[in-house]
Amino acid sequence: MLNIKKLLIASYTGCLLFMSSQVEATDIVSVNIHGNSAEAIIELPGGVSADITLEFENAVGLTAQNLGISAEVVDITSQALLQRLPSITDIAPSAAFPMMITIEPQLTSGFSFSGLATVDIHTHNLEYTAGTPLRFFKAPLNGEFKDITMTMGAGSYRARGSTGRFSQFIIVADLRPQVTVIDSKYNDLQTALNNFSADIDPAVYSALLQDLADVNQLMLLQNYSAASNKLNTFNRRISDNSGDKVPNVWRSSRDISNVAGELMAYANTLRFSLRLAN
């Protein structure tokens, strides 16, 4: 009986989510392209609004249509959403800003970019205060959300993240202990480097492994400033070898990995958390 009840609840929740996605239609006020950057101004029902800016090192075929940006008001109590977070108990989507932004270019759009993409979000629905737990999270389409925050600032609330591929974005309150966040981000970076090992020049890969081993040792000593500086070395090494030795292109056909962009993005958000802990 209990299993049947769970199935009924899951089915009912799925129906509500489907109905919500139909009713709360996206209203992108404008998408402006300027060279290697794109800005979208978004206004959704209930006065939920934001502007989001993407900056690319080099983009090909960047148009409003090719970018494939959309947004929706989400149910922040939905189990389908909450289960995509690293922790249901310590992380919660923002009730004052229940917006999820999706950037998902069509496979055949011909859009591509190289290196790192930075993503800036600004909203008047939230207020920045010192020590705020608000963070900028991203996920692959319908996948697990992770913190990508690089910087935060005032002007209501502003945050910047970086990525090597496209994603879904939300703002959450993250109440996890800082050491937990740091360990999680380090593990994500180490796992990503391991997974990309076959794509990276062996000598460069070996040097990057040593860089991360040094970062880990400094973290164990709680020398977070030195660990952050070592991550700068890690990112410079990737940047200096991007291209033939470290693949650095994302394209809409999704047939190759932007190794450089992804690794640098993981390093950037880890460095942010190390600065907070310092």
Regions found by a protein language model. Give the residues of each.
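Hydrophobic beta-strand residues in large extracellular and virion-surface proteins
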Residues: 42, 52-54, 69, 99-105, ...
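Soluble extracellular-acting proteins and domains
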Residues: 172-278
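Proteolytic processing hotspots in large secreted/extracellular or virion-associated proteins
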Residues: 31, 35-37, 79-134, 202-204, ...
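Proteolytic cleavage junctions
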Residues: 26-48, 110, 126-133, 138-204, ...
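Sec/Tat signal peptide C-region and signal peptidase I cleavage site
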Residues: 19-25
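Bacterial N-terminal signal peptides that target proteins for export
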Residues: 2-11
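Bacterial N-terminal signal peptides
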Residues: 10-18
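Predominantly extracellular/luminal regions of secreted and cell-surface proteins
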Residues: 43-85
